[in-house]
Every structure is written in C-alpha cells, then in structure tokens.
C-alpha cells in the first residue's frame, strides 16, 4: 500500500511541476493571472492523502509498515522544498496523526527526533505543531 502513497506523491509532484512550467512567467504576481500555486491539483493531492490514510489505518497495518509510512510522510516534503508541491506535502504531514496509535513508543521517539531535525519549531504550521505534540506525547 505504501507504493500507492509514493505514487500519489510522484504524480502530484510531476503535475505541480507541469502546472508551473505552463504558467506565464509572472502568473499570480500582484494578483494577476492564474497563480499556479492555487491550481486544483494541490488540494486534490491533500484530499487524496487523507482518504489514503483513512484506508490505510482501516487495513490494520503492522507497526513496521506504519513507521515506514510515517517516515515517508515526514521526510518527503523537505526533498521538494523549492517546489510548489512542498506546501501541500508539508500539510500532509498532519496525516501522521491517525497513525500515532499504531506506532511503537520507540518509533514515536525516532519520529520526534527526525521532526526536530527537519522542521524548526518556528517554521511549523499549527497542524504540524499539533502532530509534533501528539508524537511527543506518545513517545513518553
């Protein structure tokens, strides 16, 4: 099932890059033209990741697989920091929350450590801050 998730991320990245390539150079600047950062592909990706996470949790995955999925969701956005896709991949980090009860305590500790390495506290949006807090609580 993780291959399906990885495929969703790859497809989304490719689509967002294509949207950016096809947009006029100053599209979206000063509110003019169609801003490629507001293309429907971004919200569609986020909605799809929520649906995937719900299906995944319902499938009763084993802890090792859950850790692989959570790590993927946490680490992937930073690989694409300079792309339009970054922000919605970053928002999708919030999809780790339903996985937390399925993770071992040590896995939660490892994810908290990795979270700290990747995302500085002052850069976290409320959803990521909430995800971090839940991971930290589960790690205790």
Annotate the PLM regions:
Residues 1-140:
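Non-catalytic all-alpha helical scaffold/repeat segments
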């Amino acid at each position: 099932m993780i291959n399906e998730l990885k495929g969703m991320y790859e497809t989304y990245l490719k689509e967002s890059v294509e949207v950016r390539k096809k947009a006029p150079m100053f599209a979206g600047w000063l509110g003019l033209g169609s801003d490629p950062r507001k293309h429907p592909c971004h919200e569609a990706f986020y909605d799809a990741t929520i649906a995937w996470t719900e299906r995944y949790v319902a499938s009763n995955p084993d802890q090792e697989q859950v850790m692989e999925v959570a790590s993927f969701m946490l680490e992937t956005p930073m690989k694409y920091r300079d792309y339009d896709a970054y922000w919605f991949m970053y928002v999708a980090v919030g999809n780790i929350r339903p996985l937390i009860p399925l993770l071992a305590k040590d896995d939660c500790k490892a994810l908290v450590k990795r979270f700290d390495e990747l995302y500085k506290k002052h850069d976290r949006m409320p959803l990521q801050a909430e995800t971090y807090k839940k991971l930290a609580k589960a790690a205790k």
